Amino acid sequence: MANSSSGLAVSDECKVKFRDLKARRSFRFIVFRIDDKDMEIKVDRLGEPNQGYGDFTDSLPADECRYAIYDLDFTTVENCQKSKIFFFSWSPDTARTRSKMLYASSKDRFRRELDGIQCEIQATDPSEMSLDIVKSRTN
C-alpha cells in the first residue's frame, strides 16, 4: 500500500523480515532504505543475531538517510534479562535535502506498518544514538 503523503509503498520483505526479528529473533537489526526509482521502502541490510550495536551503527551510511530496527538486549536494575525493539530514523546532516524530506514524510506511516516497536530514536549524528542514550530509553 502506498503512503498517502509521500507516495511510497512498503515492500512485503520489510514486513516479513521484521516479523522474523520480532518472533524468531532471526536478526539483531534491519536497515531499510527508500528506493527512489521504485518509490518503495526496501530492506537494505540484515544484522545477524550475534552482531552488536557497533556493527549496527557502522552499517548506517554517513551521508544517506535510513530507517532501522534494532533488537536491544539489556539487564534491568532488578537483574532481569529483557529486550526492546527500537525504531531509528537516521537523517544525517550531510544527506540530500530531498532525501531528508522524503524520509521525514514517510516515517510515521512506515513505523505503523511494523507492529511491536517499543522505542524510537531520531538521529542526525552518531552521538545522538550512542549506546548509552539508547539504553537510557529502556526505562
Swiss-Prot record:
Gene Ontology terms describing biological process: actin filament depolymerization
Keyword annotations: Actin-binding
Listed PROSITE patterns: ADF_H (PS51263)
SMART domains, per database record: ADF
Keyword Transferase carried by entry: no
Protein's UniProt keywords contain Chloroplast: no
Domain ADF-H: 7-139
Tissue specificity field: Expressed in pollen.
GO cellular component, one term: cytoplasm
GO MF entry, a single one: actin filament binding
Superkingdom of the source species: Eukaryota
Pfam families linked to this entry: Cofilin_ADF (PF00241)
Protein family according to the UniProt entry: Belongs to the actin-binding proteins ADF family.
Purpose: Actin-depolymerizing protein. Severs actin filaments (F-actin) and binds to actin monomers.
Protein name in the entry: Actin-depolymerizing factor 2
The encoding gene: ADF2
